[in-house]
Amino acid sequence: MTAILEKRESASLWGRFCDWITSTENRLYIGWFGVLMIPTPLVATSVFIIAFIAAPPVYIDGIREPVPGSLLYGNNIRYGAIIPTSAAIGLHLYPIWEAASVDGWHYYVGPYELIVMHLLLGVARYMGREWELSFRLGMRPWIAVAYSAPVAAATAVFLIYPIGQGNFSDGMPLGISGTFNFMIVFQAEHNILMHPFHMLGVAGVFGGSLFSAMHGSLVTSSLIRETTENESANAGYKFGQEGETYNIVAAHGYFGRLIFQYASFNNSRSLHFFLAVWPVVGIWFTALGISTMAFNLNGFNFNQSVVDGQGRVINTWADIINRANLGMEVMHERNAHNFPLDLAVAEVTFIDG
């Protein structure tokens, strides 16, 4: 009898725990994806803070001297970074307990793999948590679908690109100057500015910002006043009210007169669908572009592609970009290039003015 009561009590305890985890009445929804998520960003964040302050230098290139990235080794907030794993390690996941010594692990591996893997697991599980909460509330799943865009971008940069290049040393350093260094080297090696998927991503991000600003300003400018002139317009509304707070017909009429009639939406659902789809699809394409360039399917190269009737090259901005790419690549891998052959053997044509 005692055993049966203990079993029932433990079962009810587990049941109460399950109900608490999946309850939508909590101030912050946890969910089963949240149970999986919580440890990973905590590990990534805590290791990042410790490493940013005190991590020893990492032998990132496999040649030359180790690169320090932490504050205690002479960097500041702008120049500090978590240095990627050494090129000597390749794509191996090298836990600290497999290293011959802790110093050797710091020298060749460092905390980069640990932080990046836990970060990617954390953001993916956060996306799952968004879907789970939507499911519990009977909502449609598009919030998680929209969040998949930055998840795809982070996965492309931190995982797909190193896999395509063959080692984690090509991953993006976790810091301000490290991010810009990654961008410059990426342009030098893959000509990303001339890749159509990157162009779609730029249109998505900047276009999304423009449309968001336009929508917000139109809504704020066409509020339905429920108060007198002596009171704030905000006092006439309450959170969750049934009635609309702004007049979409007025906003549609204003924008239609500002540009032309069919440039504005007269349907709120269509408008918000457009506002969601535009940046999300753009960022999806950027992530896809990073993933293709990871395997060296690079941007367009129009090097010396314009010639006159006698076959002489007419230099264009594309040739200027290629020269800049070569210069950036030499600065990045100065031991691997004595001088780029493309520049060394190029014929220089002087034109008398």
From Swiss-Prot:
The D1/D2 heterodimer binds P680, chlorophylls that are the primary electron donor of PSII, and subsequent electron acceptors. It shares a non-heme iron and each subunit binds pheophytin, quinone, additional chlorophylls, carotenoids and lipids. D1 provides most of the ligands for the Mn4-Ca-O5 cluster of the oxygen-evolving complex (OEC). There is also a Cl(-1) ion associated with D1 and D2, which is required for oxygen evolution. The PSII complex binds additional chlorophylls, carotenoids and specific lipids. Tyr-161 forms a radical intermediate that is referred to as redox-active TyrZ, YZ or Y-Z. C-terminally processed by CTPA; processing is essential to allow assembly of the oxygen-evolving complex and thus photosynthetic growth. A quinone binds at residues 215, 264-265. The record marks 190 as: Stabilizes free radical intermediate. The modification N-acetylthreonine is found at residue 2. Chlorophyll a ChlzD1 binds at residue 118. This is Photosystem II protein D1. It comes from Cycas taitungensis. Photosystem II (PSII) is a light-driven water:plastoquinone oxidoreductase that uses light energy to abstract electrons from H(2)O, generating O(2) and a proton gradient subsequently used for ATP formation. It consists of a core antenna complex that captures photons, and an electron transfer chain that converts photonic excitation into a charge separation. The D1/D2 (PsbA/PsbD) reaction center heterodimer binds P680, the primary electron donor of PSII as well as several subsequent electron acceptors. The gene is psbA. It is a multi-pass membrane protein. It is found in: Plastid, Chloroplast thylakoid membrane. One of its GO terms (cellular component) is photosystem II. Residues 345-353 form a propeptide.
